[in-house]
């Protein structure tokens, strides 16, 4: 049975669009095609999830949006301008995976956040009052102002994630790419990060979140991209997260269980419950569709040092 492919119709770049990827193909020097026929459009004021198995092209797509890879075909527009123009204006920020950072490098929290201001400084890279003010505001927003003089390697996993979010805020970026922001953090920290992303969405920013944590995606992502060297499905998360689409994207990687109610009174929303799990955070499908969990109480307090 062919999966229920959900792909948004082609959209021409215009005001209000954050990231537009049109018919993109990326090939490496060895001839390997890492990504092909990739098309989607994410409007401003949106949180979108990028979901797929390891090696499916997520990192390639991020690198293409950041301008690190030459496109063999197609184009990428960011905020109705070329990637190069968006980068020159410091409009794209990247929050890396934890394993991509050398936590032993001796640098203070405030210095990491100040790196987000480099594009706003002159040739000598001397921070001005506006740069210090931006760093202060960013640290306060992620509740880490009291840890600014700490070595970043001394922080907890969740605090480290929030430092790089603060760097993106100090940069004054409008598009933020987050690579596995919930890996190695507890539920409380995950909720804090999600709350911040939701606030940024209200400000009209665009966030593309690469994650393996399927269970949390329906809670905060407006749209979802399923990727496997091409775009398998793109659209509203509730429409993309179907059993057929997930089996095509994750077949053989995630365990899948279906619970079918035998009760004649279960013809409603709980007649069929599917579970996709990798033992981290299961994704629950009710009658074949993903649903967000009830919102938990918001807690803006930071982790203990």
Q: What is each stretch, according to the model?
A:
Residues 66:
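Helix-to-loop junction immediately C-terminal to a conserved catalytic motif
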Residues 74-85, 92:
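Conserved ABC transporter NBD signature motif
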Residues 2-4, 8-21, 25-37, 44:
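A short, flexible loop at the N-terminus of ABC-type nucleotide-binding domains that lies
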Residues 114, 129-147:
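Conserved ABC ATPase "signature" region
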Residues 243-244, 248-305:
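ABC ATPase nucleotide-binding domains
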Residues 176-180:
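Catalytic Walker B motif of ABC-type/P-loop ATPase nucleotide-binding domains
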Residues 151-155, 159:
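Conserved ABC ATPase signature
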């Amino acid at each position: 049975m062919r999966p229920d492919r959900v792909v948004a119709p082609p959209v021409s770049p215009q005001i209000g669009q954050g990231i537009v990827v049109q018919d993109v193909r990326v090939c490496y020097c060895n001839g390997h095609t890492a990504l092909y026929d990739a098309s989607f459009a994410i409007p401003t004021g949106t949180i979108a999830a990028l979901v797929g198995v390891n090696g499916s092209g997520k990192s390639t797509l991020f690198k293409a949006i950041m301008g690190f890879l030459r496109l063999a075909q197609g184009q990428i527009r960011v905020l109705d301008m070329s990637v190069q123009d968006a980068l020159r204006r410091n409009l794209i920020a990247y929050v890396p995976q934890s394993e991509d950072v050398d936590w032993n490098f001796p640098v203070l929290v405030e210095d990491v956040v100040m790196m987000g201001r480099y594009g706003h400084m002159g040739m000598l890279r001397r921070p001005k009052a506006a740069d210090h003010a931006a760093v202060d505001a960013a640290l306060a927003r992620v509740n880490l102002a009291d840890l600014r003089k700490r070595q970043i390697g001394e922080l907890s996993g969740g605090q480290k994630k929030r430092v790089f979010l603060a760097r993106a805020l100090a940069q004054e970026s409008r598009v933020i790419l987050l690579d596995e922001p919930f890996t190695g953090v507890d539920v409380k920290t995950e909720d804090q990060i999600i709350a911040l992303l939701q606030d940024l969405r209200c400000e009209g920013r665009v966030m593309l979140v690469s994650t393996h944590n399927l269970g949390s995606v329906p809670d905060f992502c407006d749209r979802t991209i399923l990727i496997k060297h091409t775009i398998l499905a793109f659209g509203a998360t509730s429409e993309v997260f179907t059993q057929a689409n997930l089996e095509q994207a994750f077949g053989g990687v995630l365990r899948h269980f279906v619970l079918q109610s035998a009760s004649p009174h279960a013809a409603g929303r709980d007649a069929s419950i599917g579970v996709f799990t990798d033992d981290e955070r299961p994704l629950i499908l009710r009658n074949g569709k993903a649903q967000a969990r009830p919102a938990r109480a918001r807690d803006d307090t930071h982790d203990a040092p």
